[in-house]
C-alpha cells in the first residue's frame, strides 16, 4: 500500500509533481535573477573606481591634461578673447594734458580788440608799456606777454604762407631758355618793362674803313657815296 502511494505520488502528471515542478522553476528563475544581478553589480564595481565613479569619467577628470582643451577652459578662453577684443577695439583715449598746466585764459571781446589794436601799433612792448597796458585791461603782465608771443608766432606763419603763395604765382609760364628777339632800335622803356632793370642803351656801331686807304679825294668819295 505504501509502495502504491509512493508510485502514485511520484507519477509525473500528478498534482503534487506539478506543484513541485512549478516551485522548482520559480526557484530556478529567482536564483538566475540573483546571479545576473550579482554579475551586473560585479561588472559595475569593476568598471568604477573606489568612489563609485565610472572609469571613463575618471579618465576625463584625471590630472593629466589632454591635447584638446576642457569645456570650462574653452569657455573661459572665448570669454577672455571676446572681452580683450572689445578692449582693443575701443577708441584710443584722448591725449592727457599735464596736471600742472594752467587753464587757458578766457579773454573778453573788448580785451581782444584792444590787444589786436595794440599789436598793430607795436609788436614788442617794453616792461613799462606792458605793465600799463595790462593794468588798463585788468590783466596780468604774464597774460599780456604770452598773448603777444602767440600773436607774433601767428603773424609769422601767415607771412610765410603769403610768401609761398607769391612764389607759386610768380613762376614763369615760358621755358627759362626761351627768349624773345628784340629789334635793333628798341627803346629803353621796353627793356625796363620786360626785365624791371634799367641799363644804358647803346646803338651798335658799324665798322668804317680808314680814309687814307683810298686814292681818291675825300670829297669825291663822299660825292659818289651820296
Swiss-Prot record:
Region (Disordered): 1-45, 85-105
SUPFAM superfamilies: Homeodomain-like (SSF46689)
GO CC annotation: nucleus
InterPro entries: HD (IPR001356), HD_metazoa (IPR020479), Homeobox_CS (IPR017970), Homeodomain-like_sf (IPR009057), Msh_Homeobox_Regulators (IPR050674)
Protein name: Homeobox protein MSH-D
UniProt source species: Danio rerio (Zebrafish)
Feature: compositional bias, Basic residues: 94-104
Entry keyword set: Developmental protein, DNA-binding, Homeobox, Nucleus
